[in-house]
């Protein structure tokens, strides 16, 4: 698989990444493993009707979770199935209990809860999920060489949506603190102790 090129850390490395990002991402997306998984997702996601269907297909679930940065939950099948089958419309739904908005976004996108419209039936849904999966996978590959660069790429991609969201300032702050890469960025930028994210 293609490994991102990082010439150095710090500002020089970031500027190089900014200049070469589109080309590097395109090359990364053409890697056999990424292409195989994303092609499979596009061809098969339309047949998913229930949460159980999705968690039963590891290849589909890999792309689905990876699109939301939740790839570490791949082996928590019962947890993911429960989250998807609960949906997000009920206030006591599992996804709504987390400060990390990625879980709510994930469940809402697939729409497999009670009385929810299945996301897979929406025009452009598969392509949108694939694009997010590719970006997140590239960030992970970048982080294998330079974790600070990964955090910067993740923040550049996700922070505008958090800041531009409709929630209160408190909600936005909790959303930032609930996402490990963003929390790490803010802890470093403001010199906050690691325990700050766990403070009530």
Predicted feature descriptions by range:
Residues 1-32:
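Short, compositionally biased, intrinsically disordered N-terminal export/targeting signals
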Residues 29-32, 36, 59, 97-101, ...:
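Alpha-helix boundary/N-cap detector
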Residues 122-167, 193:
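Extracellular/secretory-pathway and virion-surface proteins
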Residues 56-62, 66-86, 174, 178-200:
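Extended intrinsically disordered, low-complexity coil regions enriched in Ser, Thr, Gly, Ala
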Residues 20-75:
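The feature marks the first
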Residues 46-53, 90-95, 158-164, 169-176:
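Short, recurring structural edge motifs at helix starts
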């Amino acid at each position: 698989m293609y490994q991102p090129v990082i010439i150095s850390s710090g500002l020089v490395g970031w500027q190089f990444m900014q200049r070469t990002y589109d080309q590097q991402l395109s090359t990364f997306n053409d890697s056999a493993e990424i292409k195989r998984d994303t092609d499979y997702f596009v061809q098969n996601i339309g047949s998913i009707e229930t949460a159980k269907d999705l968690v039963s297909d590891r290849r589909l679930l890999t792309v689905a979770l990876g699109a939301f940065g939740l790839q570490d939950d791949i082996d928590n099948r019962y947890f993911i199935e429960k989250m998807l089958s609960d949906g997000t419309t009920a206030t006591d739904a599992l996804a709504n209990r987390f400060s990390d908005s990625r879980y709510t976004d994930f469940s809402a996108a697939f729409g497999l809860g009670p009385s929810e419209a299945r996301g897979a039936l929406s025009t452009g849904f598969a392509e949108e999920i694939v694009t997010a999966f590719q970006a997140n996978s590239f960030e992970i590959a970048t982080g294998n060489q330079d974790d600070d660069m990964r955090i910067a790429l993740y923040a550049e991609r996700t922070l505008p949506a958090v800041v531009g969201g409709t929630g209160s300032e408190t909600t936005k702050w909790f959303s930032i603190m609930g996402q490990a890469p963003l929390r790490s960025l803010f802890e470093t930028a403001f010199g906050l102790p690691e325990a700050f994210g766990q403070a009530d």
